[in-house]
A protein has these predicted regions:
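Structured, contiguous alpha/beta core segments that scaffold functional sites
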Residues: 1-201
């Protein structure tokens, strides 16, 4: 039987022997918690980015594999001119976990035909979470009253854009306090730990 003495048994990210093996023993706990946090973010984003994309539809016979369409081809091959699917989904997952929300602008274009034409999806662009705000149009300024819009400000050009919800894919974490936006994973973990510490002292 072959064995490899360099292989360590399973250990957590804060295991002292593991940290020593990685050459980061003696590091302050606050720094270690940051290292652990971002290591977990990296693992989550890379795992999601590697997952295959499958396209389904609801039919009278139940859920079945659907025929590929333009959106599916973009997600599978190249969401936009700057990103591969793995880079795209990795960035989406990082924004979702770290900021609580990830936003993707669905850019469309009008394809003119001999008689009329049609709107098609051209590409998909990630809007950094820190630069995007959810807006509920109570007064009907942008359209029908009560509709949801996404206000995005380009930090490089300084220009702002307002997109209807139909043109934005919004991914949020599993915990939401208003039903519209997700809470950052860091805040969820902090609240959980503080709750456990509080119960331990009761």
């Amino acid at each position: 039987m072959l064995s490899n003495k360099a292989i360590r048994p399973a250990a957590g990210a804060t295991d002292e022997k593991l940290l020593e093996w990685l050459g980061i023993s003696g590091t302050p706990k606050k720094v270690l918690s940051e290292v652990t946090y971002f290591t977990c973010l990296k693992m989550l984003s890379e795992t999601l980015a590697k997952m295959p994309i499958k396209f389904y539809q609801q039919t009278d016979k139940g859920v079945e594999r659907a025929e590929p369409n333009a959106a599916y081809e973009l997600l599978k091959t190249r969401p936009n001119s700057q990103m591969t699917p793995s880079v795209f989904w990795g960035a989406v997952e990082n924004n979702r976990n770290h900021c609580g929300n990830a936003y993707v602008w669905i850019r469309r274009q009008f394809n003119r035909k001999k008689y009329g034409g049609e709107m098609v999806i051209k590409d998909l662009w990630i809007m950094p979470s820190a630069d995007t705000t959810i807006v509920i149009d109570d007064k009907g300024v942008f359209g029908a009253a009560g509709d949801i819009y996404y206000w995005y400000t380009d930090k490089y050009s300084g220009e702002s854009y307002v997109f209807p919800s139909a043109d934005v894919m919004h991914f949020k974490t599993s915990l939401s306090f208003d039903g519209l936006s997700g809470a950052p994973v860091r805040d969820i973990l902090a609240a959980t730990i503080q709750g456990e510490i509080g119960r331990a002292h009761v």
